[in-house]
Amino acid sequence: MCEHLKSMDVLKVETFYQPNPTAIFHHICRNRSNTLLLESAEINNKKNLESMMIVDSALRISALNMVVTLEALTKNGESLLPVFKSLLPKEVRILSNDNFLKIKFPSIVKDIDEDKKLHVLSIFDSIRFLINSVKNNKGSKSMFFGGLFAYDLVSSFENLPKLKTSQSCPDFCFYLSEILLVLNHKRRTCYIQASLFSSSNLERNKLQHRLLEVKNKLSQNFYPLESTSLKKMILKCNRTDREYEKIIKEMKKSIMIGEIFQVVPSRKFYLPCTNSLAAYDVLKKNNPSPYMFFMQDSNFTLFGASPESSLKYDTLSRKIEIYPIAGTRPRARKIDGSIDLDLDSRIELEMRTNHKELSEHLMLVDLARNDLAKICDPGTRYVADLTQVDKYSHVMHLVSRVVGKLRLDLDVFHAYQACMNMGTLSGAPKIRAMELISNAEKEKRGSYGGSIGYFTASGTLDMCIIIRSAYVENNIATIQVGAGIVLDSIPQLEVDESKNKAKAVLQAISESHSCHIELNIENERHTFAG
């Protein structure tokens, strides 16, 4: 079959460095679907590190339940579909057979050995088949996929309650880059890359022309980011403080009788959001984070500034990392809004020595160790950093880093399948905690608690947990936040923590729409005039 595989070529041009990725995205991508901006900043000094932007996508691959959809967005992307179809095993049914290819995978027997389950045919194989459609694809970013794995993807692999949803978020959604723009903020360099999958000279000429077009756009004056003004914002939540506190108390009962040790129930806040990019721009300026993202899909927009890595893998070293965060405190501020350094340091010390926070954190470090033990070579797993503190605009977190060496018989998708969803967004034991979450929340989480980032055909993967984020559909932003509950949890403090976690995103939306809101949430609806 190898003679049928596609050969790819990478066309690359260096261009002018621009320090403002949001302005570039607005200037080049505007409101086009299937575009993505991924950014990173130093935790300590908040300086930008790297920005990657999918300007044009060749193909969109998504999954919902056991059905995978491949949508060719260009002729270049379309050229991959015949080879992809030839790689499908007979167990996979083709439901529609055109540029909008739909395929159905068989359901997985969920009550089998964990290691056997990793090797059973699954929707993750659709990504593997797509990667394997191209034979010379191992350049560092030559075959670059950006997008998300939803929290609810786990339901295809574990026996969890079936839930309703009002959102259009699939179980996973990734764009295969056709035009990728990469900014290195430390070196102040920029290059644009085109990935050519078609053997057609016409397609090659199109991509060469598109490279020059994007390069020329970078030398033009940028369109200013439009300002949006709303006279009032109605802030809603799906659960009042009292209702959320009741759920927390019920979860504590499950902990007391020994069903679970820790669990992360969540609540949702809703705000109007008619200018998502402006809100993202404010969020990243106010709250620079290791992972910042703006995903513009045909059905939704997702943006955020996440402090927490989900899974990170380096192909050369085979090193795989989990970065558990558990333990949160608000930053201390003076009346003028600046950080009160003395009080801030005392709050940090209290968090570092708090029995409840330490027990919750160490429980999740242990869970991360157990997750990696399933997929790593024996003797390679260790805790690289333990109970450090990372500080952001509104909160500080207790963090650790757990590292191992991935087994040779596994790839990053096996690793993700084995580790989802991260314990810091589910609990321990993980499956029972997720069952209790489903029973309490009664609807799908969608993007919240899943992950967003990128992977390449060479095997590199870097994803963050989707928190401190807004999922926007029909001009309504959903901001979902949770609190880690253990035996020592004080319900009112956990309610307060959920609101502290929401503040940065809610403030960014209100500021970008010139409308003031407050966070005194006791009823389901409040009007905040600005």
Swiss-Prot record:
Binding of Mg(2+), residues: 360, 497
Top-tier EC class: lyase
Family statement drawn from the similarity comment of this UniProt entry: Belongs to the anthranilate synthase component I family.
Chemical reaction(s) catalysed: chorismate + L-glutamine = anthranilate + pyruvate + L-glutamate + H(+)
Cofactor: Mg(2+)
EC number(s) given by UniProt: 4.1.3.27
Key words, A-Z: Amino-acid biosynthesis, Aromatic amino acid biosynthesis, Lyase, Magnesium, Metal-binding, Tryptophan biosynthesis
Pfam families the UniProt entry points to: Anth_synt_I_N (PF04715), Chorismate_bind (PF00425)
The species this protein was found in: Buchnera aphidicola subsp. Schlechtendalia chinensis
Notes on how activity is controlled: Feedback inhibited by tryptophan.
Keyword Magnesium: yes
Example GO molecular function: metal ion binding
Record: residues binding L-tryptophan: 40, 290-292
Name under which the protein is recorded: Anthranilate synthase component 1
Annotated chorismate binding sites: 327-328, 448, 468, 482-484
Biological processes, Gene Ontology terms: L-tryptophan biosynthetic process
Pathway(s): Amino-acid biosynthesis; L-tryptophan biosynthesis; L-tryptophan from chorismate: step 1/5
